[in-house]
Design a protein with these regions (language model features):
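P-loop/Walker A NTP-binding module and the surrounding RecA-like catalytic core of P-loop NTPases
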Residues: 1-167
Length: 167
């Protein structure tokens, strides 16, 4: 099973990836988290920490953008990497290592833009996920419908997760 997470930056995709991975592991599955957000500073590191806490392995072959003293810098020798290749390669690894569920954490933006949607579509087309979950902050307010429509048109999501409802 391949699950792709999509949504705006800060919506809770990375945290959901860890929670979902933990729940699946606890239910007897063998999940793999995939670090395909190579643009947000330290996103790969965050997913690695979340995966470690959940006891779920993380496929993170590229460092993505790192931050150094509060300033975003690219990892040595790369700008941010190729998230489509990371996602595609993770599926092959999952088949080889017998992971039964792959959870792909994708990049977000502060707002909807064509670059974000193109990257999400490219990942979707490369891995053909069973589920595309649109993750949205429950506190987003008036912008929720517009954002949901944009993601539905952009990646044709199959489910919605409202995040940050736990207090």
């Amino acid at each position: 099973t391949i699950i792709m997470l999509a949504g705006l930056q800060g919506a809770g995709k990375t945290t959901l990836a860890g929670k979902l991975g933990y729940w699946l592991k606890d239910s007897g599955h063998t999940p793999l988290l995939v670090a395909a957000d190579l643009q947000r500073p330290n996103a790969v590191t965050q997913l690695q920490v979340v995966g470690e806490r959940a006891g779920v392995p993380v496929y993170a072959p590229e460092k993505g953008v790192q931050s150094d003293g509060g300033e975003a810098v690219a990892a040595p020798g790369q700008t941010s990497g190729d998230p489509v290749k990371v996602a595609r390669d993770s599926i092959e690894l999952a088949k080889q290592k017998l992971y039964d569920t792959v959870i792909i954490d994708t990049a977000g933006r502060l707002g909807v833009d064509e670059e974000l949607m193109k990257q999400a579509r490219d990942i979707r087309d490369a891995v053909r996920p069973n589920e595309i979950l649109f993750v949205i902050d429950a506190m987003i307010g008036q912008d929720a419908v517009k954002t949901a429509k944009a993601f539905d048109e952009g990646v044709d999501f199959t489910g919605v997760v409202l995040s940050k409802l736990d207090g």
